[in-house]
Amino acid sequence: MRIAMILDAKFPPDPRVENEAISLVDAGHDVYLFCLKYADEKEVELIKNINVRRYKSNKLEYKLSALAYTIPFYTLLMKKKIHQFIKTVKPEVIHIHDIKIAEAVFRANKSFQLPIILDLHDNLPEVMKLYPHLQKFPGKYIISPKEW
């Protein structure tokens, strides 16, 4: 099976994603990993039989990711990249790592209608309740864990 994994960060060094991808490769699947790059890294690379595709990002997109479910700029920016990734690798299923990029994947997938697995590594809405910057102005009024 051709599996598209979506990660909203650099790769490597995420061991949870790497271990999961390697397990899928070892089980006979073809894994294509969408990830971001912030420097001069290879756009396409084979790492431990994981087909890594890196898409250029920047500090502004990174900061906008905190507002992904408040103001959808990040979602709109990522949707375009993810749509291109899906069109290029032609997966049979999409595996999303983490909630920040999930809405962008759902929107990008509307025209493909592929099955999606959402793997929430962390309960981000609960974790966000502990962030000091979300307990005071302006974070308290801009970012709502309930929306996540």
For the regions a language model picked out, list residue spans one by one:
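Short, hinge-like loop/turn segments at secondary-structure boundaries
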Residues: 48-53, 112-113, 133-137
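Active-site beta-loop-alpha junctions enriched in small/polar residues
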Residues: 8, 99, 123
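An amphipathic, basic-hydrophobic alpha-helix
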Residues: 62-94, 100-113, 145-148
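Acceptor-binding helix/loop patch of EC 2.4 sugar-transfer enzymes
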Residues: 57-68, 117-148
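Receiver (REC) domain switch-region micro-motif
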Residues: 3, 94, 116
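Generic structural signal for helix capping and beta-alpha/helix-loop junctions
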Residues: 13, 41, 62, 103, ...
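Structural motif
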Residues: 34, 96-97, 119
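N-terminal subdomain of nucleotide-sugar transferases
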Residues: 1-41, 46-51
